[in-house]
Amino acid sequence: MSLMSFKSQVVDAATNKSKTETINYRTTYQDKEYKKQATVYVPAKYDNKKKHNIIYLMHGSTESGRDFYQDGNFKKILDKLNRVDKLKNTIVVFPTYYPNKSFVNSDYYRDRPLNKNFAKKELTKDLMPAVEKKYHTYAKTTDNEGFKESRRHRAFGGFSMGSITTWYVFENNLKYFHDFLPMAGDSWTIKPDGGAVASKRTASRLAESTDSRSFQILAAVGANDGTSGSMTPQIEAMWRLPEFNHQNLKYYTQKGGSHSPQSIGKQFEHYAGELFKK
């Protein structure tokens, strides 16, 4: 083997491996600026000259994006999905809704304003422009128009409080996203635990967020996860409205699944092949 051939094989091997990278950006919360980071999964054979689908996946209470990425074993899952062409050439971003570590606390009800702020402001104004300027997605420009035109190639999902965030993203940013993966968490748009205690009002509020644009909600929960007590009545109430049906709103119960990042990884894998379908 020639030296040139050996070098070429080394380069090919490096290119064929996925990467875990970090992106830095700034955001403002309650008139104070914060420096933040998000973990980014970059697929094998990433080519900055080609367009890539993109998913934003949010963690649960007290976690960070990096924690969720590692605890859910997402690198292994995403490598496998990419290898078998089930979710090929897709960038996956793992952000956090906490402005910094001082906001982390064991009372997850206190996270609600942070979930809402992230969905309504930080996601589209700060995170998405930073990420999609660095990586080549379907957005021709990293402004509102560019994000609108590329919405069919963008998804948002999350676990637990990240699922609460996902419902807020659906409610406020349908124009920028087509696919949604709320896992192990209901919508708190009316009130905390609203899927259980205000299921009809919650469903109606979410229905009001829809328009002529198509969308896909891929909801999931573990069979042994107590959050099913909030998710199930909400999903059933949504199905009773004309805006939702069993095609644009699916609900998967994972056999033996628990309220854990590990179960969420499996729920994500279950739905991966249904993302970004035209």
Residue ranges of each PLM-predicted region?
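Bacterial N-terminal signal peptides
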Residues: M1-S5
